[in-house]
Structures are given as structure tokens and as C-alpha cells.
Amino acid sequence: FTLFSCSTVTAGPVNWEGAEKYITIQQKQFCDLKNNHVLNLYNAIESRNEIKINKVKKQRQEDLDALLPSGTFENWIVKLVSIKQVNSPQDQTTDGDSAAVFELSCGTQIGSGSFLIDGKLTWGATIKFNSRQYREVSKLSSGQFAIISGTFLKLNDFVPSKKETFYASRPLTSGDLQNDKNDRYSNGDELFLSYITYIAAAN
């Protein structure tokens, strides 16, 4: 399996069956943690015990901290879900950036995301306009596979007022868990904000 620049015309994986064998041990362990977390969180929510729910969330974060020192991941193979150009004239730090979302084989999404904070739409983990990563991601199409490296963003980095050190994500809800085998969940009902430091098409 060889990495080429995005401009190189070469055969690459077209589905997860073809891409699975290139998944790194770190990426596989991340998906294993995710699958275990879904089951544990479902059982905790069913118990209607907030202490159990919080314990499950804390344990998942501790497991992720052990697997991903400083939140860093390297050479994960992903499928591009979408790329948007951020239009945020009220926030010049992200205006014009790229908001890219990628999907793992286990359905979890990683990349850029937007959240409402105090009634204001705020973008996190965008790809800076005209950066090398921006130029590379601009060559990709939805459904195409790529190799990426990056860093998960913690919630208190994104929202300084928050005390939690959990990785910033669009959370799973009880509805998501009840429908964990349907198309909605498999298309990524959990999104982790992640700064992308490297990207190349998986040709």
C-alpha cells in the first residue's frame, strides 16, 4: 500500500472491504473502544442512574487517554463524508476555512464541527484557508479514502468555561443507542473534533 499525492491517478480502495486491511492497530483499538462504549453507555442509560452514566463516560475518556497520548493519532485510513467552506464573517479566525468530516470503519466521524455556544454558532477544528492541508483536502471527493493524522480537541480547549477534559464531540443520545444498527448511526452519530495535521489521498 503506497501513498501518493492527491493529484496522482492510481487505483485505491473504493470501499471498506478494500480499506480494512490498511487500518492501523491504533485505529482498530479506537473502534474497539467505541463499540464497547456504545454497549456500556446503553446499559447505563437503561439503568436511569446518572452516576453509572458519568462513570462510563469517564472510563471511556481514560481509555482514550491511554490509547492516544495527548490526543494524537497517526496514519488513519478514513472515508471523506463532506467538505464545506466556512462562512463566518463574524469570526475571522475561521472564515474561509475548510470544514472536513471523515468517517472511520466503525461509523465514528472525526474532523471539523460547529456548536452553539451562548447562542452563537462556533466552528472548531477547521482546516486553515490556503494551508497545505487545505490544498490537499480541496482535491478530494465525498466517498474517497484518505490517510490522515491529527489531534483530538478537548472540550475545555474549545469551550474554556467547561471544566471537563473529555474530547469535544457531538454526543451519542439514547435515541442513537437504540438505533445503533440503523443507517443513521452507521453514518456517524458521534463526531470528534480533530485538528488535521496531515492528509493524503489513499491511492
Q: Which residues fall in each region the model found?
A:
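Classical Sec-dependent N-terminal signal peptides that target proteins to the secretory pathway
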Residues: 1-11
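OB-fold and OB-like single-stranded nucleic-acid-recognition modules
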Residues: 9-203
